[in-house]
Amino acid sequence: MQKKYVVALDQGTTSSRAIVFDHDANIVSVSQREFTQLYPNPGWVEHDPMEIWASQSSVLVEVLARAGIHSDEVAAIGITNQRETTVIWEKATGKPIYNAIVWQCRRSSEICEQLKAQGLEEYVRENTGLLLDPYFSGTKIKWILDNVPNARAQAERGELLFGTIDTWLVWKLTEGKVHVTDPTNAARTLLFNIHSLTWDNKLLEALDIPLSLLPEVKPSCSVYGTTRIAGEGSEIQVAGMAGDQQAALFGQLCVEPGMAKNTYGTGCFLLMNTGTKAVRSNHGLLTTVAVGPKGEVNYALEGSVFMGGATIQWLRDELGLIRDASDTEYFASKVADTNGVYLVPAFVGLGAPYWDPNARGALFGLTRGANRNHIIRAALESIAYQSKDLLDAMTKDSGVSLKRLKVDGGAVANDFLMQFQADITDVEVLRPSVCETTALGAAFLAGLAVGFWESVIELEHKACIDKHFIPNIDAETRVRLYAGWQDAVARTRA
């Protein structure tokens, strides 16, 4: 039977999805299932790894059944995943010894402080491209080994395996035959040297983590093993995987130095491909691994904003100013400007490039004439201002002045926001026809790995732009508006 489709498994923080793409990179079928968020203590976030697997495997069955697709027609399955989330399981039984510790979880803060006290901060920055923060997997692994009874003894005996979610899914799909990750996920563990592309012995020693725990690192665009859907039908190749933000970068075909994308979700993630050069950031960004045009390792600068779409949820849920996120475009367009109002949504501090956990949200510039529309508009504009903060930092670090920004995520449907993003950055903003770019990136990697598609050049002919947003304000206005934003940010940090 002819191979007509590629399936992407998109394992996210709140739901597991499966998306089928045809040879023209069109979406054929989608299935999604949410799973339980666990909060056992303040600042702790966990998932049940078995529930993640159950939700992911069930949507895989469902997405094919819904479209009437036979497993013989599927060329490959690609994987993209929430990054940093940590699972440890028994090699012999496949049973997790503890819940997955999620990227958002802050329980390992004390371990990070111990590493800082040992003088490891600069070594971590130089060799992993990351900051010493509980966000990343390494300190989560140490916490499990230190706190789960008998875990360290089992690990020393080589009886346990660690994986980020990509590794866990491949292990389950291949029925325990394959223990593997890719460089984009490995680079988020705090244990991977992004220059030598190997596990870092000094950091393993500092965290007391046995090497036997860790997966083999294979290219993002390669075949890892095979699986059968629900144990039935013909074998399908599991091929191609990347962490969610790097998958989106590849899905947008940002495979050359200086190409960048911004994902507008709960927060915003802006990544710029820097090619074969790992650029050290002096402006609060992370240096991370990306995927090049032939599936090889490239590097990227990454900046994250904590409050993107979450700011709009706040308008809806806490202030009751809107009923639906889509209402914001209508209300924001009813006024010519914000009437001098700025919203700095530092509800949980500020992310890149400030990294200020103590900053708090604030509204500035309120006068008697300020109304609901001005506040809603200021909330939308805050997303674009924060993205400009990241872009400016990237320009300073890389020396590359961006001309075009590719965008994806839920908020890109908002034309007002996209136009203001173009205006305030003085950069053309490109919105793709298929906004599921994270899943598309996983599908592209899988399809390229098995020859379903020949090259990135072929994929470029399939990538359609829905709309171009061209900068439409003068330089003087741009400078004045952004100066107001910078002043507002400074005051939230005072």
UniProtKB/Swiss-Prot annotation:
Residues engaged in binding sn-glycerol 3-phosphate: 13, 83-84, 135, 244
Binding-site positions, ATP: 13-15, 266, 309, 313, 410
Cellular component, GO annotation: cytosol
Annotated metabolic or biological route of this protein: Polyol metabolism; glycerol degradation via glycerol kinase pathway; sn-glycerol 3-phosphate from glycerol: step 1/1
Keyword entries, A-Z: ATP-binding, Glycerol metabolism, Kinase, Nucleotide-binding, Transferase
Binding-site residues for glycerol, renumbered to this chain: 83-84, 135, 244-245
Example GO molecular function: glycerol kinase activity
Keyword ATP-binding: yes
Entry EC no(s): 2.7.1.30
Domain of life per record: Bacteria
Matching InterPro entries: ATPase_NBD, Carb_kinase_FGGY, Carb_kinase_FGGY_CS, FGGY_C, FGGY_N, Glycerol_kin
GO annotation, biological process: glycerol catabolic process; glycerol metabolic process; glycerol-3-phosphate metabolic process
Amino-acid positions noted as binding ADP in the UniProt annotation, renumbered to this chain: 13, 17, 266, 309, 410, 414
Entry annotated with the keyword Kinase: yes
Reaction(s) catalysed (UniProt annotation): glycerol + ATP = sn-glycerol 3-phosphate + ADP + H(+)
Activity control mechanisms: Inhibited by fructose 1,6-bisphosphate (FBP).
Function of the molecule: Key enzyme in the regulation of glycerol uptake and metabolism. Catalyzes the phosphorylation of glycerol to yield sn-glycerol 3-phosphate.
NCBIfam families assigned to the protein according to its UniProt record, in alphabetical order: glycerol_kin (TIGR01311), PRK00047.1 (NF000756)
Family matches, as PANTHER family: GLYCEROL KINASE, SUGAR KINASE
Family indicated by similarity: Belongs to the FGGY kinase family.
Designated name of the protein: Glycerol kinase
Organism: Shewanella baltica (strain OS155 / ATCC BAA-1091)
Phylogenetic classification of the source organism: Bacteria, Pseudomonadati, Pseudomonadota, Gammaproteobacteria, Alteromonadales
